[in-house]
Amino acid sequence: MAVDTTTVAVALAVVLPVSIAVLIALVFWCKTQRRFKREEQDDEKNRGYDDEVVTFREMRASSGTLGPDGTPPTACAEGSGSSEGSESEKDPSPTPAPAGRAARTYMPAYRRRLNRSLSRQQSRADEMTTNSSAASYDTQHAQNAQLSVFEQMVPVLQVDNSSPFANPRDAAFERGSRHSSESLMKSLKNQDFGSYPKRRPSAANTANLAVYNGSVSSFSSRVPSSTTLNCMGDESFYAYEGSVLPRTGRDLPEVKQDVYMLKNNYDVTNNEEITEEDQYENEFTNYSENKREFIDSLRPKAERMSN
C-alpha cells in the first residue's frame, strides 16, 4: 500500500503546530494552578494571624487606655520598659487555620503585601506605645489611631473635618499646602500680565480739553467739571505751557487746533477728500495706487488712451 506524501505533509503541517501549542498551554496552566495553590496556602497561614490581630485591636479600642480594673497597662505604669519586657508582651502566635476550609475569595498579591506592611507598621507602633511612659500613653494612643477592617480594604482619604483616623501632621501639611496655593493664586490675580499702562493725556489733548471746558461758560464763574477735577491729580496735566490758560472774566473764544487726524483713511475735517496717506500702507500694500489702477481698468480703452 503506497503512502500518499501529500496527506502526510498536510497532517504534519496541521497536527504538529497544534500539538505544540496545546502542550505549551498545558505547561502554563499547570504553573498557574501551582501558583494559585501556593497563594492559597499562604492565605490560610496568614488568615489566622490577621483575625487575631484585628480581634486584639478591637478589644483594645473598646477597652480604651485603661485596663479591665480601671488601671493603666502594666508596661505604661512601670515607665519605659526594656526590650526583654516588650518582647514578652508581643502578639500571640497565630493559630493555624483548619486545613479543610478553602479560600472563598481571591485576594491579589498587592493587597496581601499592603496588609502585611500595615500589620508591620501597626506592630511597631504597638511596641513604641508599650515602651512609652504612662504620661505620654494617652497622646500617642490618640495620634496613632488603630486601623479598622474597613480602612484595610477601602482606602480612606484625608479631609478637612477632624476624624478619628486623621493624622494631625497630614492635616497640618494639607492646610499649609492649601494656604500656599491660595496665596499664589492671589498674587497672580494682583499682578498685571500683558496689559497696557494707562494712557496719559498729551499736551495737545490737554489743551483741547481745557479750551472746551472754558468755552462753555465763563471760566471764573462756572463750576469745574468732573473731568477737570479728575485730571487734577495727574502729574502731566499742568506740565506744559500750552495747557495753562489765563483766568479772565470774559468768555474765551474756542481755539481751533490744526491737528491732522485720520479716521478710516479719511480726513476728519473733509470727508469728501480721500487722503493719499495711509497709516497701514507700505511698499507691499499700496492701497491708493491699487485702487487707482482698478478704477482706470474699468474705463474704456479710448478714454484711457486720451488721458
From Swiss-Prot:
Name of the gene: SKG1
Residue intervals on the Cytoplasmic side: 29-307
GO biological process, one term: cell wall organization
Protein name (database record): Suppressor of lethality of KEX2 GAS1 double null mutant protein 1
Sequence segments annotated as region (Disordered): 61-137
Organism: Eremothecium gossypii (strain ATCC 10895 / CBS 109.51 / FGSC 9923 / NRRL Y-1056) (Yeast)
Membrane-crossing segments per the record: 8-28
Residue ranges that the UniProt entry lists as topological domain Extracellular: 1-7
Protein family per UniProt: Belongs to the SKG1 family.
Job of this protein: Plays a role in cell wall integrity. Affects the cell wall polymer composition in the growing region of the cell.
